Each structure stands twice: as C-alpha cells, then as structure tokens.
C-alpha cells in the first residue's frame, strides 16, 4: 500500500495533504456516528432500518482492511478498526430484533444467525478475492464504493417496502450522507493531485458509482421526509378524533 506513503507524494499533493487527512477523518467519524445512531434507533424501535445483507458486506470489507490488509496510514487503520468493532454490535442488534419480528418466516427466524454468518463469509471471500485481483489499495476503495452503493440502495428499498420510518431516523441518513459526501470527493482529490499513485480512481465507473450513491441517498432523504410527514399527519388526525370522542 505505497499509495498511503504520503511523504513520497509530489509537492502539489503535500500542499493539500492536510485537506486529505481532514476529509478522511470527517468521513470516518461520520460513519462511526451512523453506526452508533443505527444501534440507538434499533433499540428504540426494536427494528433495524438497515438490511443484514448490506451490514454483512460492510463487516466483511472492514474485516479485510482492519485485519488482513491493514493500511499503513495510522488514521485509516484506526478508523476502519473502530468501524469493524461497532458494526459487530449493529449486526447483533439487527439479528436480535429481526428474530422477534413477525414479518420474518419461522424458518428464517430460527436459522438467521447461521444465515448471517454465511452471508458474512461469502462477502469476506469476495473482498479477499478482489484484493488479490486488484491489489489491497484499489480493492479497499472499489470494495468500499460497492459497499456504499449496496447499503444506500438496500436502505432505500427497505424504507419504501415498509412504508414507515420505524428503525430509521434523520440522524442515520444525515450522518451517512455527510460521511460519504466527504469521503467520495476525497478520492478524486487524490487522483488529481497525485495521479501517479491515485490516477486509477478517476474513471467512468467510479464516477458512476459516486453518482448512483448521491442519487440513492438524496432520494432516501426525500422519501423519508414524505413518509415521516404522512405519519405525523395521521397521528395528528388520530389525536383530534380522540378529543372529539
């Protein structure tokens, strides 16, 4: 992972090195806040607003780059390790409440921990294979973008399918959106100011994935607002009817 040896970067990158570090720190902190908020919201509503599919994918990616291909950059290694540790509890809470839900079939409820473990192992082998094929640094960012789009798409689909905001919250969406809104452009900044090491990141597929993320997460915010407002209107109407009775 020579790309993380910022001391070897050209002078133009050194001038904005503080910006790159700040962007990564903001993005990393935002995702930690998102995970913690996800846990709190799930405990409050006794349901998770994130799919186990996307959480297993995230955990597999975090395991590969916190344990197997640990970045030599201190902040990056520390942030990914914290993500891994917190995400383990996110998955625990999600599995716990999914097994209590009547929307899940009895067969799946009984075997959900095993299914979750198999999903994690499946994604883990995929991220390891991607690292062997592309190299650790490229796999870290390509895999990370795939995780991002998968999480955003599945969260949006879950919100639309349920038609209610239980298990979700504005803080969950906003922390995720802010974290990735800093992290994604940060990769392109590296490509512009250090093209010999990071030029591979500036391509049409990475731009497409970035655009899809923004489209999905902005749509999530708009739909969440619409559903939340409808819930408040129904609640207000119910209160008025109760008073009349």
Swiss-Prot record:
Main localization (coarse): membrane
Chain segments annotated as transmembrane: 19-39, 48-68, 75-95, 112-132, 140-160, 177-197, 208-228
State the disulfide connectivity.
none
**Molecular function GO terms recorded:** lyase activity
Q: How does it sit in the membrane?
A: Multi-pass membrane protein
Tree of life domain: Eukaryota
Query: Localized where?
Result: Membrane
Pathway(s) this gene product operates in, as recorded in its UniProt entry: Secondary metabolite biosynthesis; terpenoid biosynthesis
Cellular component terms (Gene Ontology): membrane
Q: Which UniProt keywords apply?
A: Lyase, Membrane, Transmembrane, Transmembrane helix
One Pfam family name is Pyr4-TMTC
Question: In the UniProt record, does the keyword Lyase occur?
Answer: yes
UniProt biotechnology annotation = Shearone derivatives produced by this cluster are interesting candidates for Alzheimer's disease (AD) therapy since they moderately inhibit aggregation of amyloid beta 42 (Abeta42).
The protein's Enzyme Commission number: 4.2.3.-
The family line of this record is: Belongs to the paxB family.
Role noted for this protein: Terpene cyclase; part of the cluster that mediates the biosynthesis of shearones, diterpenoid pyrones (DPs) which are structurally diverse meroterpenoids consisting of a diterpene linked by a pyrone, and which may exhibit a range of bioactivities. Within the pathway, esdpB takes part to the biosynthesis of the molecular scaffold by catalyzing the cyclization of the prenyl group initiated by protonation and ring-opening of the epoxide to produce the diterpenoid pyrone scaffold.
Q: Can you say what this protein is called? A: Terpene cyclase esdpB
Q: What is the lineage of its organism?
A: Eukaryota, Fungi, Dikarya, Ascomycota, Pezizomycotina
């Amino acid at each position: 992972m020579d790309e993380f040896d910022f001391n070897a970067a050209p002078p133009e990158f050194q001038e904005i090195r503080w910006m790159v570090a700040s962007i990564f720190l903001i993005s990393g902190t935002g995702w930690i806040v998102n995970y913690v908020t996800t846990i709190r919201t799930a405990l409050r509503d006794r349901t998770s607003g994130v799919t186990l599919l996307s959480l297993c994918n995230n955990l597999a990616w975090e395991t590969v780059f916190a344990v197997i291909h640990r970045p030599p950059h201190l902040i990056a290694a520390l942030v990914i390790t914290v993500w891994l540790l917190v995400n383990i509890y996110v998955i625990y809470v999600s599995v716990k409440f999914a097994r209590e839900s009547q929307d899940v079939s009895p067969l799946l409820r009984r075997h959900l921990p095993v299914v979750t473990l198999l999903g994690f192992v499946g994604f883990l082998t995929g991220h390891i294979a991607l690292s062997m094929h592309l190299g650790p640094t490229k796999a870290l960012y390509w895999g990370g973008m795939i995780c991002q789009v998968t999480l955003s798409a599945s969260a949006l689909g879950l919100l639309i399918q349920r038609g209610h905001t239980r298990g979700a919250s504005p803080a969950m969406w906003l922390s995720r959106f802010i974290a990735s809104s800093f992290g994604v452009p940060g990769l392109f900044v590296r490509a512009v100011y250090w093209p010999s090491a990071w030029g591979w990141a500036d391509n049409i597929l990475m731009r497409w994935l970035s655009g899809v993320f923004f489209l999905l997460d902005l749509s999530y915010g708009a739909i969440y607002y619409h559903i939340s407002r409808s819930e408040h209107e129904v609640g207000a109407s119910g209160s008025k009817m109760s008073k009349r009775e």
